[in-house]
Amino acid sequence: MAKRIVCFGDSWTYGSDLVDPALVPVLEKEGYSVQDAEYKYFHKNLPYREEHRYSNILEKELGIPVDNLSEQGDSLIGMRVKFIEWMHQQPKDCPSTLVIFATTAHERYSFYSAKDKQWLHSGYLQYGGMHHPLVEHWKRHLVHSSSPELHDYTLLDFVMTTRALCKEHNMSWIYAPVFPMNSHGRIEDESVTEWSMSDICRQREMEGHKVWAWGEHPNELGHKFIAKHLISFMKERKLIQ
């Protein structure tokens, strides 16, 4: 049974667009959009974002520690490296640890900047949210290297690596795709959820619930629904009591 959970993922796991309502009028008065809270008031909004994302809801509901090691815009490439680095710091035998991989679109790409000591993700390259001397070079690389075969390999490499390391360290794991599986590759594993996080939110939206935040991310209620589905899945697999 899990006594600790660790989450890896992209902006959905990070809690993007979860903004403290008290900051909304401040941002509007200063001429910023609500989505600018992450950059203009990072430290002020941090407690609110962390409290309302699904990982913290899991921690409260299950009464066990949950570490969130996600990053906005992350790719399977970036998540894979972060997981390996984290794994090197763990004991050889971790039977009470459960890892949740909130897998993202397999066509995403990440470059590591040794100078900046951070990952630079293709989403920011494509939408102009990154300023770096090598941006034009990376854009050219993405155009000439993108292919269905490469994307499928990226997903396969991620799944095989993470699964093998979890088995080696006697950890449990879950693959919980953010997007519908058939749209971004399919994971063949007994520990993958039959639903995606976006499926959950769209279904609840059809039922009349307001589940979306300011951008294309779940709001506080959306994160509650995601946590509820994860808990049900964990109980079905007897990963938690």
Predicted regions and their residues:
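Serine-esterase "nucleophile elbow" of acetyl-processing enzymes
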Residues: 1-78, 225
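Short, glycine/acidic-rich beta->alpha junctions
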Residues: 50, 79, 154, 158
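Alpha-helical cap/lid subdomain in secreted, periplasmic
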Residues: 84-241
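Outer-membrane beta-barrel proteins
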Residues: 76-86
